Amino acid sequence: QAVAFPAGLIGIDDKDTRLGKAVVNLLKHDDECNAHYPYPQIAARMGEGDVALKYIWNGVNVHQMYPQGLMHNVTGYPDNIYDLASVHNLLKDTYMIRSHDFFQCGMEPMSNYCTGINEMMLQSNEGKIRVFPAVPAAWDSIPMAFILLARGAFLVSASRNNSAEVTQVGVKSLKGNLCRLQNPWGDKKCEVLRCRDGRKVSVKTGGDGVLAFSTQTGEEYVVRLIGTETLVKEVYFGKPNICLLYTSPSPRDTERS
C-alpha cells in the first residue's frame, strides 16, 4: 500500500491496474484494525473517499480512546503495568522504554487525519493537480472550499457547492511553472483567466482531460466553465466549540459512594 502513499508511485489513474486493484482490495479488511496507519491517505490517493472518511472516524472514535490522543497500552497491559522492571521493547532491543498504562500517539493522529483530509481535497502526485478527488458521499450536500499547496509550487484554491459541483478553481503560481490541472468538469469546456486584468490565458487540453497553461511567478489565475462568472471571495465561518462545565463531586457525595 505504500506504493500509493507515501511513495506516490500510483494514483487514481492506476486504480484499474493490477497493482491499483491490489491496493484498493487491501483497504477492505476489518474496520478496527487500521490503528494510526495512513489508511485515510492511501484510500484518498486511490479515489476512495468513503473509505478514507471511514478510517478517519475509526481512528478517532476507536483507536484514539481519549481526547488528548492517549490510547491504552495493549502490549502486556495490565499484566506488567505494576512491575517496575517492565519495559516495552521497540525496534528489536534498540529502543527500550518503561511500560506505561497509557501511550501517547504523538504526531501520528494529527498527521494522519489532517493529511488524509488534505488528500481528499487536493492531490498533485500524478504530474497534475486534482481538486476534490476523493470527497465522500456524506459530504456531497455540504459546501466546501480549501486553499492548499500543490507540487510544482502552486497555491491552489477551489470551491464546491451543496450540489457537489465544483464552482471554480484558483491557482497562484509561486515559481512560474507550467500548470497541469485535471478538468474538474469532465469533458466540459472551460477557460483560464489572469486575475490581474481578466485576460484569457492560452490553454491546451489533452486527451486525458488535463488542462495545461503557462504561468508567471506571482500571478493568480481562475479556472472556470465557459459562460460562468468568476465568484467573489467568500468567507466561511464555523461555530465555536461548546464549553461544558464539569463539577467535581462534593465530599459528601464521595462518602455516599
Where are these regions (language model features)?
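C-terminal beta-strand-rich structural cap/linker in extracellular carbohydrate-active enzymes
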Residues: 206-242
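Surface-exposed beta-strand/loop patches in extracellular or lumenal glycoproteins
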Residues: 172-186
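Conserved small/polar residues in nucleotide/adenosyl-binding loops
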Residues: 246-253
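Short, well-ordered beta-strand segments enriched in hydrophobic/aromatic residues
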Residues: 156, 166-173
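Catalytic cores of secreted or luminal carbohydrate-active enzymes
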Residues: 107-155
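Surface-exposed loop/edge segments in extracytoplasmic proteins
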Residues: 198-204
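Solvent-exposed beta-hairpin/edge-strand motifs
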Residues: 182-198
